[in-house]
């Protein structure tokens, strides 16, 4: 089986009417750390395991 490169795309919203954002993290451990730091202030989060790498993608909140 081929060892494919991947990253985690986490899309989130801080409150029902609040800002939404997206961050790219390299591994599930990083996702867990982010959730532990930010979980209390997140209304929802969507986690996607994406093929490839996150080079050139910018974390943002709008």
Predicted segment positions?
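Short aromatic-glycine-(Arg/Gly/Cys) micro-motifs in beta-strand/loop hairpins
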Residues: 1-19
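N-terminal start and proteolytic maturation junction detector
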Residues: 13-16, 34, 51
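A short, exposed loop/beta-hairpin motif centered on an aromatic-Gly-Thr core
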Residues: 17-29
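Hydrophobic beta-strand residues in large extracellular and virion-surface proteins
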Residues: 8-10, 25, 31, 35, ...
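Short, mixed-charge low-complexity intrinsically disordered segments
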Residues: 36-62
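Generic alpha-helical structural signal
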Residues: 2, 20, 31-32, 48
